Regions:
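Glycine-rich nucleotide phosphate-binding loop and flanking beta-alpha elements
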Residues: 26, 44-45, 91
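Mid-chain, well-packed structural core segment of small domains
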Residues: 51-80
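N-terminal first-folded block
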Residues: 4-39
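Contiguous effector/interaction surfaces
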Residues: 2-16, 88-100
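C-terminal structural segments of small proteins and small subunits
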Residues: 72-106
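Structural signal for conserved beta-strand scaffold positions within catalytic alpha/beta enzyme cores
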Residues: 20, 64, 82-84
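N-terminal positively charged helical leader segments and presequences
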Residues: 30-53, 61
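Short, ordered loop/turn segments at secondary-structure junctions
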Residues: 23, 42, 67-70, 88
Length: 106
């Protein structure tokens, strides 16, 4: 994962503007709380489908990105299959960096 993106994600963590795993699914239906979701490339197909379907339904941007271990390392956890950013500005920056290809991911 590229350093700029890691720093932006860490900023979201410090600002407590994030959600993990199943919390993402329940938070989606509560208005505009989630702005961007990073789904691990090595998450199970069933998990990817569940997240993608729900996020598409609620028109929330998502990206298949990184691995479960890399996402988990940012939070000092083992593995995380999905990481959501709640802050619009941070989400916009992360999405822009990923779409520009400014990373060494998958």
């Amino acid at each position: 994962m590229q350093e700029k993106i890691k720093n932006m994600i860490r900023f979201a963590i410090r600002a407590r503007q994030y959600a993990l795993g199943e919390t993402i699914i329940s938070t989606c239906s509560k208005g505009n709380a989630i702005k961007l979701v990073l789904i691990a490339s090595d998450a199970s197909e069933a998990s990817k489908k569940k997240y993608c379907d729900k996020l598409t339904y609620y028109k929330i941007n998502y990206v298949i990105y990184s691995t479960k271990n890399e996402l988990g390392d940012l939070l000092n956890k083992n593995e995380i299959s999905a990481f959501a950013i709640k802050d619009a500005n941070i989400a916009k920056q992360v999405y822009k960096l990923i779409k520009e290809g400014d990373w060494y991911g998958i």
